Amino acid sequence: MTISTLSDWTGEVGTVTIGATKADGGTRSGTVTIGGERDLAFIGNPPTGNRPLIAYELCDDPSLWPAPVIRFLGDRASDPAEWARFAAGEYRPDLIRLYLTSTRKRGFSAFAAITTTVENILQATGLPLIIEGSNDPELDSEVFRRIGEAGEGERLLIGTAEAGRYRSIAASAMAFGHLVIAQSPIDINLAKQLNILLREIGLPHDRIVIDPYTGALGYGFEYSYSVMERIRTAALKGDDDLAMPMISSAIDSLTVKEVREADPSASDRTSVAWELYAMLPATVAGASIVCVRHPSTIQPLKAAIEALWSPPGGGA
Amino acid sequence: MPTVTFLPGFRKTELPSGSTILQAAQQAGIHMNVVCGGLGKCGKCTVYVKSGRYDFDREKYGKFFTPEELEAGACLACQTSVLGDVRVLIPEESIVQEQKILIDVMGTTTELNPAVWKYALRLSPPSLDDPSPDLTRLLWGIEKSGGPNEGDIYAPLEVIRRIPRVLRESGWRVTATVVLVPGGYRLVDIERGDTTPACYGAAVDLGTTTIVVFIRNLIDGSIMGVASNYNRQISCGEDILSRVTFARKGGLKKLQALAAESINAAITEAANNAGIDRDHIYEVVVAGNTIMTHILMGIDPAYMIEEPYVPVVRRYLTAAASRAGLEVGENSGLFIFPAVSDFIGGDIIADILASGMAEQEDISLLIDIGTNFEVVLGNRDWMFACAGAAGPALEGGEVLFGMRANAGAIEQISLDLETFTPAYRTIQHTKPKGICGSGLIDLLAELLRACIIDRTGRINTAIEHERIRSGRQVPEFVVAWKGETGIGKDIVITENDVKALIMSKASILAACRTLMKQAGITHAEIARIYFSGAFGNYISKENAITIGLIPEVPVERIFPIGNGAIEGANLVLLNRRKKRFLDEIARKIAYIELNAEPSFMDEYTGSCFLPHTDLSLFPTVEEMLEKCRLRRGVP
Amino acid sequence: MALKALDIYKLLPKKNCKECGEPTCLTFAMKLASGKVKPEDCPYLDENVREILGASTRPPVQRVKLGVGERSFAVGDEIVQFRHEKTFFHEPGIMTAVSDLMDPDSIQAVVADVRDHLLVRIGLDLRLNGIAVWSASGSPDAFATAVEAVEAVAELPEVLMAEDPAVQEAGLAVCGNYRPLIHAATGDQYREMCALAVKHGCPLAIRAPDLDALAGLSGLCTAEGVSHLVLDLTSPSLHDMLNQATAVRQQAITRTAPALGYPVFLDTRPCGLPDAALICGVLKYGSVLVADPLSEASRKALLVLRQNIYTDPQKPIQITPGIYRVGSPGPDAPVLLTVNFSLTYFTLQGYLEASGTDSFMLIVDTEGLSVLTSVAAGKLSETLVRDSLKEFAVPDLVKHRTLIIPGYAAPLSGKIEDETGWKVLVGPRDAADIAEFLEKEWT
Ligand code: SF4
Ligand code: FES
């Protein structure tokens, strides 16, 4: 076949490895590597780089979590370790992403609990972990220090650095050997700026995963989709400050009107559809990690990613 | 007491022995550069002592000078005490130009081709042999003196009425004045005797806030007088939009009268200073923004500020000056610069003319900065222009201790990159009261170099230093301690100030980049950047580039043109041949509406970073910042 | 490749004669570069230049229209590979499949459902587009009967999926006047299929084992007089569909393989992952998508995704300015000001609803610009706020005089207070923090 895709790209997305096994000084049962693409997502025979991965999201304070998930999980949602064990065992995501939502309550001061929660999750699953800390500059330095310390050696991916508050999280990542999610509000320039800021305070590019912020389907998703495409093409054109893998999570998917108001009998199906129809496009736009909250989304999403990844004859 | 004589002007002053030369200069009313405030740190107050007894520590301050300079008597004025009579040469670099409103004695040379001629005539009285009428006699006289053909000169009734008396009372020795207007030659005055040397014109910059007037001698082109003054329309609204609103509510007449009044006042002041009669001003050339010139001509500007934003007139306008209420010679001409759109007015056309960019093959970028900014990109074949709002930050507005370029404003500042100690210079060398635009640009660049702010303008509060503190709401940096200021409190720059400045500079840079993109031009292809506007002359080119206010080009390609509007008006006044060229310029310009340009917002966010998100656009700045970071070590 | 304004300008006569309706040749060049005028509008271009300009400004993907009447739709006319480069112009048509093995009643039920299904979002009607009739039986009669069943219920655009020319002809005999898409010509029977397409004036889908063969076939079909082609890239492999559709789009817009400058047809059934295939089809260059009937959840998500992707990224969707209520606010409820950029509106509305605070949203007209942009562009100003308060009679709605403005509008707070006399509270920058903000500040 002579007519094929035109791949005259010169750049390459950097690779990032998350998690550490015993051999690397951690306790994970395996590690995952993302990035490395030299073309658009899924393009090429075989595609370049690494297959996009699925992270399953959970939290330590379910009162701020979408209702359809809590309904689906029942009691399991009250214990993050149990939650993680269940999701990892039954649904087989590639990573677990824990939100320390407890830190977002007003007047939070239970810093010791952070250490315990992180340790418990580390024990509950052997999957590589993503940990989301506080989003209050007042708490950040203590929270991220705790996370960093509790997960020392595990090569966690921790979030979320923003242009307004990136120093504490970067400091923790540098001190304890972790990776950082750098989030900017749906804008390629802002994404790049944050990466430069992080580089300038000493966090190397291979420790950064870009989160371009993802709007829910129907609520600005198209902006995120295009920003991801732009970031990816910029990287392929050789812009080193944008050549990091991306993580995408449409965190509002399960609270949008369409899902909230869905008929109870269709609640799960609607939840899955809303997550699938945002996260599969995110992988096509170039995201290396896509995140879901409804356990039932994992299987169809995984099947779709595999079908997109495998050239015919390459096995599914 | 010793006497200090300043060369080259021989200005003298007496003061007690032991005083510094700097003090002597201040006493003599000479404004010297004292960037470091007279601490002997900046080396900007260089003088050469030519003779007399004085004391200066050559060992300590020798590093500022070359051996040749020391040989020639170089000293730092602030560190040299006078012990007896001395003669001191102040090199031009050490003198601060007068601040206030920018009045620039034009640098551009042009041929002298005014549109006004005066003819001193000795006519023979009529007789029975020679009974031709007075007017014919006069016009014949003009023709014989080398003027236009008798048949080509139009004489208005008011002038004709005066002819018989003036001719006879003067014993047939008169001076006739002829002006070339678009319709042809026009006899505008007849006077007794020979008044040919009294031939003047006025160039006017009609700005929204200020008005500047130059009176020029049209015989030799020399400057007779200069005056400036606030636009009295300010009483009807601070900014341009409120003026239009005022005009809409039936206030057009009043605004027109105020515009004329403001110009008249400035003309009168300049004429009085020069000791000339306003009636001898035969032509007035006005450059102003589109709304201002519409108002001056009494044309309703209301439709310009609503979609689709069309001005009533685009091409140049002429009329008798008296019809606009200008108090100059009764029949004198008035010439109004053409405009491109409501946003690109005659002031910008004047900028373009003054810069000379419309005559060059190389591509130039012209930037006029005020609360609103205009940018023009192009050469003699094509031009793109756009306009937008930069916000008042760069003029000192919306910045906590920002101020206009008045006495007491810090207009230049540098930081010691180790100790963060500022060295600054204020306008008129009084104690600092605030910081003006050029000072803010310096400050931003220095804060960045010192790694006190990151590229988004956030102050790094992790640095422990007395000048960096958390402030009431946001972090701030102390520029001057209470004791050293003229306002009794610390002068600071807050993180919000820095952000406002970044947003302002970003809109300007984004506008430049949008035009460049539209034309497909890279930084390297820009042969010249012209800077016009209030602070254009005082701004540090390096720092303007460091913060990304303008695209990076080698600094020698940057030319401040000061007040381009008044310069352009002067050029047209002195050389009438430029008039036709103005319409040509105006026609060549393609106006780009930034709000309709989808890439503008992208350029804007890209520019909200110091200097820009695409670091490769500012290679030397990057190199410099890299060094600064290395020196400080990674925090 | 697209030419820049200045490149075009260099080719123009530079007479500035205004005959094209533009003030200068340069403005004409700018408009030509952005496709707002045609080269023909300037009478002074020589043939050569017109050719160059025409070739570089004509859309590289052929426009093709399916169906007639109200529900007909056009695809193609695309000019970019990524939507952020400009926009995608024509949404793919989603064609629900029925087979001629189904009994007419079931067919009609499907058709009626497609006809009536409607989702209204942001003031726009989102619909499925048409029916693909699949010849599973191979019998011309059965096919004709199925097509008749479809026709009996609704005038919807159709795809007639029958590769046997005889079967195809039977279907066309029923609905050939209504511009169905003929599916599909192959190397073996393209002459007959082309003849049918010419006879009925219908667009024709073509299918070949690989892209080279497809380009060849496309040439053969145009030689037969069919210029409204659609390229069938269906494959059991999702990976292949994505790769081939990407290749076709790249080749078309770079004009390296003009024979591939046609819209793409994808049948999502063979790959066994209907949702995934539809998603890829919407994202990556499908123009006609065939699918089995979907669950309501998938259907909604699909229509919304398609709307999202085909929204012009340069023209934000706007909300009509005015007062909007969240819950049932009373005279003490907070008034939150924001801009009429739809995303901003929906985001704030979502969080306000979630916060459970009854409130008023005052939406002012910033021409669809976001808060940050409209502040920067001077579109959001104190006078606009003042006029909007008045226009929407906000003082009559509430007893208090406090206005909550978005965090990014903070620089305007003083001016708004001066201009309106209202007290201004600067809200959070991120709508997600609104609940917390209200809890703290609004008691
Ligand atoms: S018609 Fe042609 S020559 Fe005349 S102005 Fe338009 S582009 Fe220029
Ligand atoms: S060295 Fe004299 S003023 Fe700075």
In which residue ranges do the predicted regions lie?
Chain A
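Structural preference for beta-strand elements that scaffold enzyme active sites
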Residues: R51-E57, D94-R97, P128-I130, R155-L157, ...
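Alpha-helix-loop-beta-strand connector modules within alpha/beta enzyme cores
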Residues: G107-E132, R145-G153, E229-M244, A307-A316
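Glycine-rich, proline-tolerant flexible connector loops at the mouths of alpha/beta enzymes
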Residues: S63-F72, P93-T125, I131-E138, P300-L301
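Catalytic alpha/beta core domains of metabolic enzymes, predominantly
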Residues: G164-I305
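Catalytic beta/alpha-barrel core
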Residues: Y99, F108, P128-L139, G153-Y166, ...
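N-terminal amphipathic alpha-helix/helix-capping segment at the start of soluble metabolic enzymes
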Residues: M1-G74
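Catalytic domains of carbohydrate-active enzymes, especially glycoside hydrolases
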Residues: S78-T101
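Active-site mouth loops of central-metabolism enzymes
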Residues: I3, L53-E82, R106-A110, P137, ...
